[in-house]
Amino acid sequence: MRSEPVGRSGHSAGPGLQSVLAHVAAAGVALLSALLAFPASAFTVFACEPEWAALTRVLVPSARVHVATHVGQDPHHIEARPALIAQLRAANLVVCTGASLESGWLPVLQDRAGNPRARDVFFAADHVELIDPQPGAIGTPWAGDVHAEGNPHLHLDPRRLLQVSRALGERLGKELPAERLAIEQRSRAFEAAWRQHLADWERRAAPLRGRRIAAQHTTFGYLWHWLGVQPLADLEPKPGMSPTPGHLQRLLEGLRASPPAAVVIASYQDPRPGRWLTGQLSTAAAGARVPLLTLPATVPETAGEKELVLWMEGLVRELLQGLR
């Protein structure tokens, strides 16, 4: 006859107690796995955008990386949530874009986190030449998202992304001197592989040069600059301001005679203005359909090197298919 397990009181441990014990054991295993994956001493990075989180993972795979934003968000406008404050408080290094992209929310997080290390931010924009600088420009609620330093969306140029990866590797090597040689090796390996992809993307994207598009915001400005695509119009009346009926009507009148090859928006933007404009332009173009292309402006939050490559590959592929 099978005996039941006996507890300290001498009573049998029934199925209910066995189930509880099983759940407790499973939870303990899960917690132990998490602790092993990220030791208490793990170097912690707070990345303002997913692209910098991905580069950090390429260079220091053992780092614990927190990401403030995701592909479905406009990085200009982020709420200073308690979870972000806690993550910034624990950070050994903060990696952001700069060029005032995070000026509306990062200082608030820094003030509330009270972490001196969070003040010495690695800003990607400090390590590349920015396009479209506007010296003396000041962003106001009436002027929109104006960046005096230049367009902050620099990660959409794979050449500049490579420059940032090199500079970030140097900074991480200083932060982690014991791992400096390993970081340098990973940086060189990433650069070699990325350059191979870059040559392939540029060769395949050659037909895009000179193609004309309308877009919402300057999110993809570096992509157009790299590929030689010509932006004709912006759906926003002012940078960062939502498209208005009056502005869209003026765009329609200006583009009707010679429609663009496509209208392009980021995946976090409202598709309705672009949908209306492409519908009107397609009607005006006597049967020639003007497509609305919705592109991801960055990688997933958990991305690494593979996802960076797939993301850039996807952008080139979508443009080749959409701008025929």
For each feature predicted by the language model, list its residue ranges.
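Short amphipathic alpha-helical segments with coiled-coil-like heptad repeat character
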Residues: 2-4, 191-192
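N-terminal signal peptide c-region/cleavage motif recognized by signal peptidases
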Residues: 37-39
